[in-house]
């Protein structure tokens, strides 16, 4: 955070230099024809200001929207993005903040809705999704929260309703569902639960009424219904029985 603050301060001072015309010599090359010193460049609709050393970008580079509002604050080391890269919309609101090492995402990448409201937090380690991934609804409530290892889901992932309640919870191992698969009612009670092995339901399945009483019971084998499946009313009386074999209804 200290590094980010210093970078922003440097950007502020550089803005003062540009606006006051303090930097007189721009877009110069050295005796070997390599870019050196302070440069102004244009890329698409963005004007960029920053320094070159030995033909490589160095330090803080600042981009501007066509309306004069800062669009980007990017840190460079020997021509590669290293440090924070910050993006700002035309209204001046922060909408993306990434961390880089040698032009590779490393650390948290944070995105924002219009108005700088948090949209997502995703953790990278040298370009690979490793760690937390958290998504938000526009009102700030969590939409999804889980963990990754080598670009694959690993551990518990939860999805949330717009009211903030957990709606679905799966357990992953190396990108595949291995462990409990659960769904929930808005009151927090379990709606359904079953184990999974390599993305397939396996073993006992249970589905409940919102008050917690058992509604449906059955069994899966390799992702297919097997044996007797029973449906109960809220008094616990069996009101329906079906028999399956290899996923096919037999009676």
Regions found by a protein language model. Give the residues of each.
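Intrinsically disordered, low-complexity terminal and linker regions enriched in polar/acidic
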Residues: 1-7
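Bacterial N-terminal signal peptides
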Residues: 7-17
């Amino acid at each position: 955070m200290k590094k980010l603050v210093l970078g922003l301060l440097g950007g502020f001072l550089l803005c003062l230099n540009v606006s006051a015309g303090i930097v007189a010599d721009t877009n110069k090359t050295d005796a070997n024809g390599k870019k050196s010193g302070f440069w102004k460049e244009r890329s698409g609709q963005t004007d960029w200001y920053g320094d070159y050393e030995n033909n490589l970008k160095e330090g803080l580079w600042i981009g501007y929207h066509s309306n004069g509002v800062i669009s980007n604050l990017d840190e460079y080391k020997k021509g590669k993005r290293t440090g924070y890269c910050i993006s700002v919309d035309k209204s001046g609101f922060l909408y993306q903040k990434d961390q880089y090492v040698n032009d590779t995402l490393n650390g948290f990448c944070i995105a924002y809705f219009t108005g700088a409201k948090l949209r997502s937090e995703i953790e990278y380690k040298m370009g690979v999704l490793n760690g937390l991934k958290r998504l938000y609804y526009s009102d700030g409530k969590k939409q999804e929260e889980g963990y990754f290892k080598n670009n694959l889901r690993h551990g518990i992932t939860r999805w949330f309703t717009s009211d903030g309640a957990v709606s679905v919870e799966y357990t992953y191992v190396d990108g595949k569902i291995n462990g409990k698969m659960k769904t929930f009612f808005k009151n927090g009670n379990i709606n359904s639960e079953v184990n999974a092995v390599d993305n397939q339901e396996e073993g006992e399945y249970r589905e409940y009424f919102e008050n917690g009483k058992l509604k449906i019971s059955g069994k899966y084998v390799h992702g297919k219904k097997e044996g007797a499946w029973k449906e109960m009313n809220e008094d616990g009386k069996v009101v329906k029985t079906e028999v399956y074999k290899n996923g096919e209804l037999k009676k």
